[in-house]
Amino acid sequence: MAANMYRVGDYVYFENSSSNPYLIRRIEELNKTASGNVEAKVVCFYRRRDISNTLIMLADKHAKEIEEESETTVEADLTDKQKHQLKHRELFLSRQYESLPATHIRGKCSVALLNETESVLSYLDKEDTFFYSLVYDPSLKTLLADKGEIRVGPRYQADIPEMLLEGESDEREQSKLEVKVWDPNSPLTDRQIDQFLVVARAVGTFARALDCSSSVRQPSLHMSAAAASRDITLFHAMDTLYRHSYDLSSAISVLVPLGGPVLCRDEMEEWSASEASLFEEALEKYGKDFNDIRQDFLPWKSLTSIIEYYYMWKTTDRYVQQKRLKAAEAESKLKQVYIPTYSKPNPNQISTSNGKPGAVNGAVGTTFQPQNPLLGRACESCYATQSHQWYSWGPPNMQCRLCAICWLYWKKYGGLKMPTQSEEEKLSPSPTTEDPRVRSHVSRQAMQGMPVRNTGSPKSAVKTRQAFFLHTTYFTKFARQVCKNTLRLRQAARRPFVAINYAAIRAEYADRHAELSGSPLKSKSTRKPLACIIGYLEIHPAKKPNVIRSTPSLQTPTTKRMLTTPNHTSLSILGKRNYSHHNGLDELTCCVSD
């Protein structure tokens, strides 16, 4: 009975989808609708899987900085499995409210602010326990710290002097440590002081009657007199009386100078009606979080002004009226609601009785043929092959499933109990995927960081890519020759990202196809093999040029040098021609003599 009784302030699981994990919410209000149903106004909490990877990296960096500041190794003693499951316990608080049917509640949980002095294993040892340390804004996509920091420094901490010994005098100048604003031993009596304060109130009322802005805000004499009786007018009058040595005549002359009576206004009078409405709206949304109130609603006001206005606003009749209305609404609202245990079968449940197939992910017309647990697919989380109940998980075409224990873990914590292959590679990356020879054979899921589906067999899920080839049609070959001016293959090759106008090519091909249908398709000229070229050169040798004879010299002896004819077989092996070959000197054989 107590387990199914939900009250305001409880952290509960909400189910919005049969295949997705539970939503974690905190009940703020329980309202009864006109139809008799109960709706819960809740505060939203988000999991790590609900926010972007960029914000997750920022959250991990923030956690690492806190760990370094506290000089504790939180995750050093944890195993990979514990680190994996600890991420499922982390939540992100938000200021977002929503209304959900109370019948979608599926149980209670516990959410607490991260305690730095407590071990993180305490969250893993307790069921349905979560923690948070950052606030997530769904509209701005930002993360902020939920708790304030201790301000350290001379601006925030007092410099404590050393304790004086017995009989030692304080050498500090007292006038610099305190300011005297009132003398209780004044020559005036209490009655005279009260009469002076009455005169100060009257001067303040008259000053508001002369001020145009004040006359608009306080249109009646009663409202002006009430505004003139506030503390700022009385404090100014008493300070004036003290500064003039309690001389009533000189103090009154200061209150009513030649330019007109002195007008003293506090934050209650400085704020307009629209600003007051914005403040009440912000106070309803954020409570006494004055930093958020200033940031989102009143950025032109200082934090000091907002805090001062808040404590003055609490003294007004409007605050008293709102407090009474809230108390009356709280009495009329529901304080608790009883939700029976949800016992309907889940659409993802795989039915194995009577040979009837179970629906996959609740999709209409999509079925999953159950297999023998001993011979079929194993659990995607714990790799178990036996379970009293199986649930389909993931995309329908993958045909993955979870056992009953892992399915409940998935619904509550939003993840699998065991780390997937992609997460293990992040912890200890394998060098095999870095090799370009192996990378082409890795499955697309592993390359994109997605978990590879486990089939329950020890065989690898990696498959080779299917071979294919491109076959050019006769139309394409003919169009390349007929439509050269339109196609312009050389220009198109230099601009690979510019689309080719196939409509113009088809139109030109259709016009010229009739007149060129009888002509054969011009084939490309092919080069003759090298052996044929060598044979032709042997049969038809090049003409020998005239022999160049040099003039005999008297100092140098006569020498003869024979230029050998290069072997043609070396040309066929190397497949290259040097400078002498290109200039027709390959057949030259001559003697150089003096």
Swiss-Prot record:
<dbReference type="GO" id="GO:0000086">
    <property type="term" value="P:G2/M transition of mitotic cell cycle"/>
</dbReference>
<dbReference type="GO" id="GO:0000122">
    <property type="term" value="P:negative regulation of transcription by RNA polymerase II"/>
</dbReference>
<dbReference type="InterPro" id="IPR000679">
    <property type="entry name" value="Znf_GATA"/>
</dbReference>
<dbReference type="InterPro" id="IPR043151">
    <property type="entry name" value="BAH_sf"/>
</dbReference>
<dbReference type="GO" id="GO:0003713">
    <property type="term" value="F:transcription coactivator activity"/>
</dbReference>
<comment type="function">
    <text>Acts as a component of the histone deacetylase NuRD complex which participates in the remodeling of chromatin. Plays a role in maintenance of the normal epithelial architecture through the repression of SNAI1 transcription in a histone deacetylase-dependent manner, and thus the regulation of E-cadherin levels. Contributes to transcriptional repression by BCL6.</text>
</comment>
<dbReference type="Pfam" id="PF01448">
    <property type="entry name" value="ELM2"/>
</dbReference>
<dbReference type="GO" id="GO:0006338">
    <property type="term" value="P:chromatin remodeling"/>
</dbReference>
<dbReference type="GO" id="GO:0003682">
    <property type="term" value="F:chromatin binding"/>
</dbReference>
<dbReference type="GO" id="GO:0005634">
    <property type="term" value="C:nucleus"/>
</dbReference>
<comment type="subunit">
    <text>Component of the nucleosome remodeling and deacetylase (NuRD) repressor complex, composed of core proteins MTA1, MTA2, MTA3, RBBP4, RBBP7, HDAC1, HDAC2, MBD2, MBD3, and peripherally associated proteins CDK2AP1, CDK2AP2, GATAD2A, GATAD2B, CHD3, CHD4 and CHD5. The exact stoichiometry of the NuRD complex is unknown, and some subunits such as MBD2 and MBD3, GATAD2A and GATAD2B, and CHD3, CHD4 and CHD5 define mutually exclusive NuRD complexes. Interacts with BCL6. Interacts with NACC2. Interacts with PWWP2B.</text>
</comment>
<dbReference type="InterPro" id="IPR040138">
    <property type="entry name" value="MIER/MTA"/>
</dbReference>
<feature type="domain" description="SANT">
    <location>
        <begin position="266"/>
        <end position="318"/>
    </location>
</feature>
<feature type="domain" description="BAH">
    <location>
        <begin position="1"/>
        <end position="147"/>
    </location>
</feature>
<protein>
    <recommendedName>
        <fullName>Metastasis-associated protein MTA3</fullName>
    </recommendedName>
</protein>
<keyword id="KW-0539">Nucleus</keyword>
<keyword id="KW-0862">Zinc</keyword>
<feature type="modified residue" description="Phosphoserine">
    <location>
        <position position="519"/>
    </location>
</feature>
<keyword id="KW-0863">Zinc-finger</keyword>
<dbReference type="Pfam" id="PF17226">
    <property type="entry name" value="MTA_R1"/>
</dbReference>
<feature type="zinc finger region" description="GATA-type; atypical">
    <location>
        <begin position="379"/>
        <end position="406"/>
    </location>
</feature>
<dbReference type="GO" id="GO:0042826">
    <property type="term" value="F:histone deacetylase binding"/>
</dbReference>
<dbReference type="InterPro" id="IPR009057">
    <property type="entry name" value="Homeodomain-like_sf"/>
</dbReference>
<dbReference type="GO" id="GO:0010971">
    <property type="term" value="P:positive regulation of G2/M transition of mitotic cell cycle"/>
</dbReference>
<dbReference type="GO" id="GO:0044877">
    <property type="term" value="F:protein-containing complex binding"/>
</dbReference>
<dbReference type="GO" id="GO:0042659">
    <property type="term" value="P:regulation of cell fate specification"/>
</dbReference>
<dbReference type="InterPro" id="IPR017884">
    <property type="entry name" value="SANT_dom"/>
</dbReference>
<dbReference type="Pfam" id="PF00249">
    <property type="entry name" value="Myb_DNA-binding"/>
</dbReference>
<dbReference type="GO" id="GO:0045892">
    <property type="term" value="P:negative regulation of DNA-templated transcription"/>
</dbReference>
<dbReference type="GO" id="GO:0003714">
    <property type="term" value="F:transcription corepressor activity"/>
</dbReference>
<dbReference type="GO" id="GO:2000736">
    <property type="term" value="P:regulation of stem cell differentiation"/>
</dbReference>
<dbReference type="GO" id="GO:0043231">
    <property type="term" value="C:intracellular membrane-bounded organelle"/>
</dbReference>
<feature type="modified residue" description="Phosphoserine">
    <location>
        <position position="428"/>
    </location>
</feature>
<dbReference type="GO" id="GO:0005737">
    <property type="term" value="C:cytoplasm"/>
</dbReference>
<keyword id="KW-0597">Phosphoprotein</keyword>
<dbReference type="InterPro" id="IPR001025">
    <property type="entry name" value="BAH_dom"/>
</dbReference>
<dbReference type="GO" id="GO:0016581">
    <property type="term" value="C:NuRD complex"/>
</dbReference>
<dbReference type="Pfam" id="PF01426">
    <property type="entry name" value="BAH"/>
</dbReference>
<dbReference type="GO" id="GO:0005654">
    <property type="term" value="C:nucleoplasm"/>
</dbReference>
<feature type="modified residue" description="Phosphothreonine">
    <location>
        <position position="455"/>
    </location>
</feature>
<dbReference type="Pfam" id="PF00320">
    <property type="entry name" value="GATA"/>
</dbReference>
<dbReference type="GO" id="GO:0045893">
    <property type="term" value="P:positive regulation of DNA-templated transcription"/>
</dbReference>
